[in-house]
Amino acid sequence: MCIRDSRSIGYVFRLKYDYDNKYLAEFTGRYDGSYKFAGNVSGKRWAFFPSASVAWRISKENFMSDLTFLDDMKIRASIGLLGNDDVSPYAFLSTYNLMDGNKNAYQTILNGKVMQALRASVIANTTLTWENTLTYNAGFDFTMWNGLLGMEFDAFYNYTYDILTAMGGDYPPSMGGYYYTYANYNKVDSKGVEITVSHRNKLNLAGKPFSYGASFNLTFARNRYLRYPDSPNTVEWRKRTGRSVDASVVWVAEGLFRSEEEIDNSAWYGTRPNVGDIKYKDLNGDGKIDEDDRTRVGRGNRPELTYGLNLNCAWNGFDLSAQFTGGALFDVSLTGTYYNGYDDNTVWTQAFKEGANSPFCLLYTSPSPRDPKTSR
């Protein structure tokens, strides 16, 4: 059994200001050190992460006193820098491994003995440091009529930079040929809004107080790569920079082949297709469908829109709660479990998947050489 020691140290401070429960401010800071980064060599082990927030409880102002239905209303804003060291330990060090493949081709003689050759698998980068996220947030919240109606609204922007990235490249064969190294390179941003609407109340039920509440929340967020180490020879439509972090790489369907003549005059992938098969777009116009015609399209597999409903009630020592969540505005590649269908109890997505007993509705409406229109 191997025991590995690790160590991290952090210093935290928080300063709060409250004037008449009307003007609020808070300042926090963290000074953190992590063993995962080089210390004595580059001084990248330690980093400072400050944040600040302010709020104005506008409902306390005299000019709001006539609005008796308003329980509380607050306007707020915040900015902060967050650090992340969730990376592999010692990624800043060089690593080596034995050359595999043909042993005779990767052997050398040292002091009269045949030795297996070593090569550098990762080149050291002692400047590796923390991943940083700069967050901006502005919003407001209020409650009315003793809690009968409440609302929270926030708009946010997150800018993440210095993301640890495996960088590829080449160097002279005398050093081993191909290599990769880690660097703080990638940049991603995310922006969106969050809304929560709530209701709570108390009633008298059978001589005992009955309380209940409900809240609905909705979040919309969209991300993209601001910088990604795309290879110089990567075609424009396959680059990650400027696109969603989880965007899929796919061929673009132009419809279905309607006739043998259309197949003869079109580009296609692999073996000759049949009438009724999918027709893909030849993005680079070279007269064939290959990997260079795959492009990054659509959204990622994480919902851009999430929503939820929370319900709760309590009476006479009993309480009950329920939670419902959902997501929308995301894309899923129909492969793996989604392709097989039966792994997750969904309807089959392929009419003739590996001899599966597919639903009649899919068989009846599937394209065929006799009827490529997908409808009979």
Residue ranges: model-predicted function:
Residues 42-51, 91-99, 168-177, 229-239, ...:
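Flexible, surface-exposed loop regions and adjacent strand-edge segments
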Residues 9-15, 31, 48-56, 73-75, ...:
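Hydrophobic, lipid-facing positions within transmembrane beta-strands of outer-membrane proteins
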Residues 4-26, 38, 111-112, 123:
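Outer-membrane beta-barrel transmembrane domain signature of Gram-negative proteins
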Residues 91, 98, 183, 202-301, ...:
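Conserved small-residue
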Residues 29-35, 58-60, 79-83, 155-161, ...:
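Transmembrane beta-strands of outer-membrane beta-barrel pores
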Residues 34, 271-277, 327-366, 370, ...:
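Extracytoplasmic gating/loop element in the C-terminal half of outer-membrane beta-barrel translocons
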Residues 4, 65-132, 150-188, 235:
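Solvent-exposed loop/turn elements at secondary-structure boundaries
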Residues 22, 59-73, 145-148, 202-212, ...:
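Short loop/turn motifs that connect adjacent beta-strands in outer-membrane beta-barrel proteins
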